[in-house]
Amino acid sequence: MAGHSKWANTRHRKAAQDAKRGKIFTKIIRELVTAAKLGGGDPDANPRLRAAVDKALSNNMTRDTLNRAIARGVGGDDDANMETIIYEGYGPGGTAIMIECLSDNRNRTVAEVRHAFSKCGGNLGTDGSVAYLFSKKGVITFEKGDEDTIMEAALEAGAEDVVTYDDGAIDVYTAWEEMGKVRDALEAAGLKADSAEVSMIPSTKADMDAETAPKLMRLIDMLEDCDDVQEVYHNGEISDEIAATL
């Protein structure tokens, strides 16, 4: 779980767990279908679809698979009747948590999310209870690279911020709608990112200790096990030392 970014440990841990469970492609395909249904099949004209395509490619989905998913959405596939639902709540240690879901049955989804919170010492909150603590951003990640070169190209392309971490990794932050454009500009400059995704970035953090960290991880595990849950975002900060024990 040792991530290069102060928020990355959860991102990377989630990707590894979803891949192990064989769920990540199912969730990405669902998002591709829904995004294409709602905004059309052209990623250049549909920021939500472009973000889903970038996520699919970052997770090594083939072009053939993602193109079929887009075609299903444009063609009105049943999966495209899903709606996006955002739940908010509080986890162990006072962590703020946002859960992004795609569902065709709100009652089923909220019951599963509420059950996870009740089992793990958290509370499902009301709309707006924690959303103000997060900002929706595009995050383009380079596991390594020349900081000055990436920063110059990123800022010229319209990025909002560039952050370098102790291990040399670099995160480029963008307005979420501009992530695809910035990534394309970076690639045109010969800078190929390791991943690109839309994320909810917390403005403050809640430090987890040896007691609260495992409880938070259990809650995240339970939420991610819900088929309707697409993403789980939180502001918990876990040190490398504690993370190594989890």
UniProtKB/Swiss-Prot annotation:
Pfam families: TACO1_YebC_N (PF20772), Transcrip_reg (PF01709). One of its GO terms (molecular function) is DNA binding. PANTHER family: TRANSCRIPTIONAL REGULATORY PROTEIN YEBC-RELATED, TRANSLATIONAL ACTIVATOR OF CYTOCHROME C OXIDASE 1. Keywords: Cytoplasm, DNA-binding, Transcription, Transcription regulation. The keyword RNA-binding does not apply. SUPFAM superfamilies: YebC-like. One of its GO terms (cellular component) is cytosol. GO terms for biological process: regulation of DNA-templated transcription. Residues 1-20 are annotated as: Disordered. Belongs to the TACO1 family. It comes from the Bacteria. This is Probable transcriptional regulatory protein YebC. The keyword DNA-binding applies. It is found in: Cytoplasm.
